[in-house]
Amino acid sequence: IQGTMNRLNIFMDTFFNENSLYEDGSIDKTLQTFRDKGLVYDKDGAVWFKTIDFGKEKDTVLVKSTGEPTYRLPDIAYHVKKLERGFDIWVDVFGADHIATYPDVLSGVESLGFDSKQIDVLVYQFVTIVKDGKPFKMSTRKANFVTLDELMDEVGEDVTRFFFLMRAPGTHLEFDIDAAKEASEKNPVFYLQYAHARIQSILRKVAE
């Protein structure tokens, strides 16, 4: 993923591996802290977080009956670890398929004594790839999808970045590949580049 992000001129100082939360015991430690504070209980072989106490209609499973944590527990453990590092503000990026998850994560952070107001949550909607006027049907289960690298290979890094920035994170984006490759006013990037070139030409003439 680092190489892909670099192509878009997005650079990260640090990458974090979720597996380390299991290896260093952070997840077990977080769960034990929940138990010590009386925030969880066992039922039907699973561990439940008392999210009703935080305004939800029902409690939420943190550990399945199989012993496997749900998304929420590692996410909470990661948030605790990051908040302990002393950052004043940070940004969470969630996909729309996890829109029901992040409120529980914030509740977990609050219940452990941290201020969730430091966390700015961005929820990104899905992107629909359109080609030849038709949506490209994607399915990760069927391994039928277009990668970001493939998209950049076809339309270029600058165009890809611009198209994604045209929409707010919570707005669904239809990425029209044909429009992105067109050298006309139908392509907003081409139009912008043309306007920039014209402005530069005017500035050069003024300087003369």
Listing of model-derived features with the role each one plays in the protein:
Residues 2-206:
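Alpha-helical recognition segments enriched in aromatics with Gly/Pro capping
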